[in-house]
Amino acid sequence: KHKLFLMIRRPPRSTLSIDRRQRQMCIRDRTWLGGDVALVRSMPNTPALIQSAASVLYATPQVNASQREKAESLLRAVGLTQWVDDEALMDAVTALSGSGPAYFFLVMEAMEDAAKTLGLPEETARLLTLQTAFGAARMALESSDSSATLRSKVTSPGGTTERAVAVLEEGGIRALFQRTLAAARDRSIEISTDLGAR
């Protein structure tokens, strides 16, 4: 794991920390920054590699509007940015968008495997899965409708999608994702606590 501390400008000095594991008090105590520094924590995710990140930022009270904008502009270069006012929410952010790409990769992997058992060639199963995921994500991004509304629009009564979605619901997909995100959040808290104790 790599840590990046970027000095934005002086005066007053401010620092952007891209290290999902360390809370701001830990960063101050373990570095030369000191207790009065204006600190912004950020949690980007791996799609930053293709300028498609979902990055969340948290600022300490010492950060002024200009410093917030400079920090955000750095992260906007690699994708979407959002702010949270409570640093504790960074653990939930880690669980959702930080670890989230792996969840989608797993779902796509499972869909590809299922398609192959139905007889589709491996490459066809892969491409159809990827394009379907891309198309659904793009529709959701470009629509003002909620995910639930979009789902209902493609779920015809008595049709194939309705039956398929019923299987997912009966299998407890919502509870499964609740446990999934809670497990990731709890692990994020454990890691931060462990680092703070060292």
Question: How does the language model describe each region?
Answer:
Residues 91-102, 151:
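A short glycine-threonine-serine/GTX helix/turn-capping micro-motif
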Residues 31-38, 54-92, 105-144, 187:
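Internal alpha-helical scaffold of NAD(P)-dependent oxidoreductase catalytic cores
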